[in-house]
Amino acid sequence: MARLRRAKRTSYRRRRRTTRTRTVVTRTARSTVRRRGGRIVYRTSKTTRVGTRRMRGGFLPLLAPILAAAIGSIPGIVIAAKQK
């Protein structure tokens, strides 16, 4: 007799499968604990990188405050030039 398989119910939007990462700071070294399936994988690194963020958005966001200050100072320069 053939056994019928029930159709698996899936939600409308499928969830992306990601691995959970948890950072554990110990006295000796910083280790990253990754859960993959049922296993736990330990990764340790000798050098701890703190505060090294990569600049996102390219070069323009870095120039934005400088450009804003330059544009804001134009009226003051014009007024000072007219007074002479």
Curated annotation (Swiss-Prot):
Example of a GO MF term: DNA binding
Keyword DNA damage: no
Protein name: Late L2 mu core protein
A GO cellular component annotation in the UniProt record: viral nucleocapsid
Location of the protein in the cell: Virion
Keywords per UniProt: DNA-binding, Late protein, Virion
UniProt superkingdom: Viruses
Bias (Basic residues): 1-20
Described function: The role of the precursor might be to condense the viral prochromatin for encapsidation by virtue of the two basic domains.
Site residues by UniProt (Cleavage): G38, R39, G58, F59
Species assigned in the record: Snake adenovirus serotype 1 (SnAdV-1)
Prosequence residues removed at maturation: 1-38, 59-84
Lineage, highest ranks first: Viruses, Varidnaviria, Bamfordvirae, Preplasmiviricota, Tectiliviricetes
Compositionally biased intervals (Low complexity): 21-31
Region entry Disordered, spans: 1-35
UniProt family annotation: Belongs to the adenoviridae pX family.
InterPro entries (alphabetical): Adenovirus_late_L2_mu_core
Principal subcellular localisation of the protein: virion
